[in-house]
């Protein structure tokens, strides 16, 4: 397949990793506000464009810097970061994945990422593993005068070399750091992120009437005993099965629990697909938000995502103008309906290739870069992204890694098999 230079728009967060690659256009996006408008009006150059003829036409974004799908193919494909956070502040994430929605083909591909995946904090992060980022974002160095994050090459000690103003340290953005890992270490754009607290996942499953899974053996979940076989698990039991049951906080046990997570996610997908929009979200006669997702989004454990006009537009493949006044519950419910229209046999799951390795005395999950490149090109690259040894830079601790399992499954094969009663049986 021929590759088009304009297919990935690079924002400031990914610029450092790609600044010498002229086949992709690096863009610096600075937070939208009055200052940006003034700078644009006065014609100050804010963007370092390498290839002006083939770059996509981009409008000002209402968001922090990161890499998203280029506008010219955004109607065909979108990439999302999915995750579930741990139970307590400071805990590693329970679940993490990248999802590619090929709108044109009507299919979805999900690559599950072990939470112990090694990222190396020397690459500009505060921690060594991706699952620890959520509660440990890298502090940001900010120039209040220019109203911009300042990269290392623009700092002169504690002063912004560009304007001479003093720099200040601010709390970083966890979601931005997560996205930056995917941008800079795996060469993928991210159009939005969807991060749900563990308690929120339990509430969602409960509201949908539970999820049906097949248990391989007798287990105790949420204080209740279940025999081997097919059972409907309600919120707390389903979440325990998906994230903590038999999990030993090791890379090996993380891969094992990913198979259980697929079971729960397949059943959850099936339940949401059976819902109508009015089941998920509506306003009552008093204007109060109701519905399954309406209740979740207005409760104590809502789904977190980029709620700007651009973020909502990228979820739904609509214009920013159409997304501007859309309520968050409405946007998420519309997104859920869209995803529910993708048949389960068109939803493919795989695991990021790698193996357990030692980083000092700590066991982490180290990728097999060659296999990562092969998997991402096969599963997530129908529109000519550059996914190669130059863009997939994730640290690999073992330079002679073992071959990982590259098998994929579709969600329809994960659901329990229920026998149809023979004719005449009740």
Which sequence ranges carry the predicted segments?
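Entry/capping segment at the start of metal-dependent catalytic domains
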Residues: 6-21, 26-123, 244, 335-336
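Extracytoplasmic
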Residues: 75-77, 91-96, 105-113, 188-191, ...
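C-terminal solvent-exposed extensions
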Residues: 84, 89-94, 105, 109, ...
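Second-shell loop/turn segments in exported
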Residues: 86, 160-172, 186-192, 246-256, ...
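Extracytoplasmic/secreted envelope proteins and their assembly/folding machinery
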Residues: 93-96, 175-183, 198-202, 206, ...
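Amphipathic, coiled-coil-like alpha-helical scaffolding segments used for oligomerization/assembly
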Residues: 145-227, 326-331
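Flexible, polar/acidic helix-loop-strand segments at domain edges
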Residues: 200-304, 409, 414-419, 423-426
């Amino acid at each position: 397949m021929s590759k088009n230079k304009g297919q990935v728009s690079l924002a400031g967060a990914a610029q450092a990793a790609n600044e010498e690659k002229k086949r992709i256009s690096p863009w610096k996006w600075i937070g939208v506000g009055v200052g940006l408008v003034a700078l644009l009006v006065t014609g100050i150059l804010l963007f370092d464009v390498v290839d002006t003829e083939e770059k996509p036409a981009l409008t000002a974004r209402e968001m922090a810097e990161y890499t998203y799908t280029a506008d010219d193919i955004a109607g065909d494909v979108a990439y999302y970061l999915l995750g579930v956070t741990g139970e307590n502040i400071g805990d590693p994430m329970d679940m993490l994945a990248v999802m590619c929605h090929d709108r044109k083909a009507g299919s979805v591909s999900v690559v599950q990422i072990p939470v112990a995946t090694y990222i190396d904090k020397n690459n500009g992060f505060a921690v060594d593993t991706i699952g620890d980022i959520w509660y440990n974002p890298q502090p940001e160095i900010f120039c209040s005068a220019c109203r911009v994050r300042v990269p290392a090459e623009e700092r002169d000690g504690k002063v912004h070399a560009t304007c001479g103003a003093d720099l200040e340290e601010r709390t970083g953005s966890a979601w931005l750091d997560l996205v930056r890992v995917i941008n800079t270490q795996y060469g993928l754009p991210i159009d939005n992120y969807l991060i749900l607290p563990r308690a929120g996942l339990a509430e969602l499953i409960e509201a949908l009437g539970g999820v049906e899974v097949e248990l391989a053996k007798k287990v105790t979940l949420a204080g209740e005993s279940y025999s081997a076989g097919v059972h409907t698990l309600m919120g707390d039991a389903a979440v325990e099965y998906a994230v903590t049951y038999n999990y030993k906080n090791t890379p090996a046990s993380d891969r094992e629990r990913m198979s259980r997570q697929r079971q729960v996610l397949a059943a959850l997908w099936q339940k949401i697909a059976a819902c109508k929009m009015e089941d998920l979200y509506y306003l009552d006669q008093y204007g109060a938000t109701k519905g399954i997702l309406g209740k979740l989004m207005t409760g104590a454990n809502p789904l977190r995502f980029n709620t700007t006009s651009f973020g909502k537009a990228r979820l739904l493949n609509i214009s920013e103008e159409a997304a501007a006044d859309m309520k968050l519950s409405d946007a998420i419910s519309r997104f859920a309906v869209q995803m529910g229209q993708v048949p389960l046999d068109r939803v493919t799951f795989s695991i990021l290739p790698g193996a357990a390795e030692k980083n000092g005395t700590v066991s982490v999950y180290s990728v097999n870069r060659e296999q990562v490149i092969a998997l991402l090109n096969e599963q997530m690259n129908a529109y000519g992204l550059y996914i190669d040894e130059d863009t997939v830079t994730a640290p690999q601790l073992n330079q002679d890694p073992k071959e990982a399992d590259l098998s994929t499954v579709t969600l329809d094969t994960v659901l329990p098999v229920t026998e149809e009663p023979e004719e005449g049986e009740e």
